[in-house]
From Swiss-Prot:
Domain of life from the UniProt record: Eukaryota
Disulfide partners: C110-C117, C274-C278, C316-C351
Annotated CDD domains: renin_like
Domain Peptidase A1: 79-392
Record-listed E.C. numbers: 3.4.23.15
Region forming the signal peptide: 1-21
Tissues expressed in: Expressed by the venom gland (at protein level).
Cellular localisation: Secreted
Protein name: Renin
Amino acid sequence: MLQSWEFVLLISCFLCFSSDALQRISLKKMPSIRETLQEMGMKVADVLPSLKHRFSYLDEGLHNKTASTILTNFRDTQYYGEISIGTPAQIFKVVFDTGSSNLWVPSHQCSPLYSACVSHNRYDSSESSTYKPKGTKITLTYGQGYIEGFLSQDIVRVADIPITQFFTEAIALPSIPFMYAHFDGVLGMGYPKQAIGGVIPVFDNIMSEKVLSENVFSVYYSRHSESNTGGEIILGGSDPSHYTGDFHYVSTSREGYWHVDLKGVSIENKIALCHDGCTATIDTGTSFISGPASSISVLMETIGATLSRGDYVIDCNQINLLPDISFHLGDMTYSLSSSTYVLKYSDETECTVAFSAIDIPPPRGPLWLLGATFIKQYYIEFDRQNNRIGFATSF
């Protein structure tokens, strides 16, 4: 028979787990690939002439044993969180990417000829007692480069949730751009429809464990640039301390993707682009806001930005004179001030505008990608339960 103190302890532990509700993943902010190149005095276009952009998944062949994906902006993001794989735990820094659905990390079997593998944490299946081989070949392509690997199964722990997960061990990882990346791999937070090789995505496996109070996850990026703490991802809900007001929800516009209808893009409250509507995706895997080349060209010309070595730039002294740029989603308008969408690197007099051009052909495009530049201003809730995305103003 339980003693009274044992009963109280048992109930307390149960309540601790069942207020489950929120499982938190701390995000660290580090220099993006773009910023790393900038610090070295290089531009993206200098080292990646054929790699201006990527876009995720092809609609055909996703469930074949060997399938491919095209990466957008080569995961040029600043925000990474930690997960573990295997028993005992092997730790990896990953990008939580709403634009894809697979988990991949470098493999211990990756040849030392690939310097990008050597410079990152690598998964060693021989060190894990819970590893199970699968072997299915996986290829992820971007521009003229590629990542090659094979599927394995092991225990993956995200926040405090352990799941049995198929993931890709990358054995061919190109030096450019991954040599400049501060993350080890990518954890896709997209829908199963986007998954390469028919793999069940990590978040779907977490949902099947029924440990979350709601089948949602939220993404918060801190606005405080001086802090190394980049924000957090919350599984199972959202944290009111990260936002003000209420969430406003927009239903996803395409089954199986985090796409929403974009009713217009305006400059100083005047609709300038997407008069007849466009499609946008909220992309946690990229830093900039991207759109069709013709639209971005008009937008940049309107604010006086010019193209220089692959990036749009403007005189830093003009930042305070630039107009707000707004995105119309659902019944709401989400505005970005110039201090948000213009980036200043070190002591340069020329500043980078955080917009880039990307032409995605039909049927997947044309498409706007709202990356970290947008997410820093607005706390985002991705709701799998109701197939919708919520937006609230971040603190």
